[in-house]
């Protein structure tokens, strides 16, 4: 895929970029290796000072950075601003807490003194997606740099200006120029990079296919990976739930970022007692969402990020309908320039159809009727994915049942699934391995060194 900025709201090419050659990649790897030797020895207060400076830049320049994001991948401008603000909060969170998360952990043994000591391991390769082009990077970079590691970013080919802007933020904040670098490279150049002995570990957020390929290469080299992959997340509503809030949140959970989110709700399991009423309200709200210019404050749904994604979503809808799914609203590309798709609702979706089995990365909801919590859990778990789940009920017994029985890395009760710097983020099954964020996230790329003093 060519490295280029294309405005998804218009289809206009904004700027093209040439991939780095081997010599430039080598120069940056040497720079990262050198920077690590210095950065790993910096004190936590010094690293925190630098990261707070990044947060300050993010807050000061949030509208300019948000504009770049919206132009490159079509996110609603107000959501882009919120994403930049979230990045700043993530930086401040790790600046305040990293030292505590990585304190030595004493152990009671037969030794005179024994403890666990955390040490950074070196340059980490981060392969990141376009859908949250700043936040996905910062939720890796903030803990990694606070831990004493250095970062090398291979960003998605359609957001090169976001990638370069992030690199400049770290440089301008005072980090060594090798502490965080962007590599403008093509997908075919990634394998050689992973194999390079100077790369000590790899983190990837992306598709199941990409995760499998990257994970296989890293495994051959015996390198640690964190993989955050796809999801087909369930959204369950029981009769005791706050009905109005559940409906409005369901619409938001399916259409956030135009449905292009790994933890967006995609399959909706509604209790039989409230199904008809829920479906009526849900379809009505989906149908009336305003689709259009992401810079318009009244717009609720922007474009999909690329024409390839648009075509893929439409193909999944068509195949699901051919398999027997019934279309209640939407189901078509919107005529005119840009990559816009109608908010879509499907019912009577067969289990062998794409809308049930695959991740649909667009504003397409599959709604199912269930008899009871047990059937909701069975259908929710009938997936190769297990990223997040949202369950709506005010029954304490049902809340405990969903929390314990849903096969996912995260369960949200009476709330929409979302990432938070204070909590670990990640999935099970084919949704990935490892965790980002929280204390777990910062420890993923550390040498947990056992110290025994006899």
Walk through the language-model features, giving the residues of each.
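Residue-level signal for inorganic ion chemistry
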Residues: 11, 32, 47, 69, ...
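Short, well-ordered beta-strand elements within core beta-sheets of diverse protein domains
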Residues: 15-20, 35-41, 126, 235-237, ...
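N-terminal Rossmann-like NAD(P)+-binding subdomain of aldehyde/semialdehyde dehydrogenases
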Residues: 1-113
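Conserved C-terminal structural/oligomerization subdomain of aldehyde/semialdehyde dehydrogenase
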Residues: 10-16, 199, 236, 290, ...
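Rossmann-like NAD(P) dinucleotide-binding subdomain of oxidoreductase/dehydrogenase enzymes
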Residues: 59, 103, 107-245, 370
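A short hydrophobic/small-residue beta-strand
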Residues: 150-152, 327, 410
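ALDH superfamily catalytic-core signature
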Residues: 14, 209-350, 379, 413
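Structural signal for hydrophobic packing residues in well-ordered secondary-structure cores
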Residues: 36, 40, 55-62, 66, ...
């Amino acid at each position: 895929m060519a490295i280029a900025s294309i405005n998804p709201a218009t289809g206009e090419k904004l700027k093209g970029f040439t991939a780095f050659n081997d010599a430039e990649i080598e120069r940056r790897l040497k720079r990262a290796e050198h920077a690590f030797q210095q950065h790993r020895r910096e004190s936590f207060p010094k690293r925190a000072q630098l990261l707070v400076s990044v947060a300050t830049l993010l807050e000061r320049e949030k509208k300019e950075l948000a504009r770049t994001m919206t132009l490159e991948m079509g996110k609603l401008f107000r959501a882009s601003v919120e994403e930049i603000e979230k990045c700043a909060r993530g930086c401040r969170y790790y600046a305040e807490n990293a030292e505590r998360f990585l304190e030595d952990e004493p152990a009671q043994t037969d030794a005179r003194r024994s403890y666990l000591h955390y040490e950074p391991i070196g340059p980490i390769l981060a392969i990141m997606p376009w859908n949250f082009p700043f936040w996905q990077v910062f939720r890796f970079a903030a803990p990694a740099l606070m831990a004493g590691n250095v970062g090398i970013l291979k960003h998605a080919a359609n957001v090169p200006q976001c990638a370069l802007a992030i690199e400049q933020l770290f440089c301008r904040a005072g980090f060594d120029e090798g502490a965080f670098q962007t590599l403008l490279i093509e997908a075919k150049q990634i394998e050689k990079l992973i194999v390079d002995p100077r790369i000590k570990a790899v983190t990837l957020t992306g598709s199941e296919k990409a995760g499998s390929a990257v994970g296989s290469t890293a495994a051959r080299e015996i390198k640690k990976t964190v993989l955050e992959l796809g999801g087909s997340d369930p959204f369950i509503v029981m009769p005791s739930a706050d009905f109005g809030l559940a409906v409005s949140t369901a619409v938001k959970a399916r259409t956030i970022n135009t449905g292009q989110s790994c933890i967006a709700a995609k399959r909706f399991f509604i209790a039989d007692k409230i199904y008809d009423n829920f479906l009526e309200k849900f379809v009505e709200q989906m149908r009336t969402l305003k689709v259009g210019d992401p810079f318009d404050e009244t717009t609720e749904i922007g474009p999909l990020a690329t024409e390839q994604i648009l075509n893929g979503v439409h193909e999944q809808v068509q195949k699901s309908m051919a398999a027997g799914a019934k279309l209640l609203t939407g189901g078509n590309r919107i005529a005119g320039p840009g990559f816009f798709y109608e908010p879509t609702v499907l019912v009577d979706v067969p289990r062998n159809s794409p809308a049930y089995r695959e991740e649909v990365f667009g504003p397409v909801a599959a709604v199912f009727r269930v008899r009871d919590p047990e059937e909701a859990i069975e259908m929710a778990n009938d997936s190769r994915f297990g990223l997040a789940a949202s369950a709506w009920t005010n029954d304490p017994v049902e809340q405990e049942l969903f929390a314990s029985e849903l096969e996912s890395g995260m369960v949200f009760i009476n709330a929409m699934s979302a990432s938070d710097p204070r909590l670990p983020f990640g999935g099970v099954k084919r949704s990935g391995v490892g965790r980002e964020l929280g204390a777990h996230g910062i420890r993923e790329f550390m040498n947990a060194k056992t110290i025994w003093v006899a």
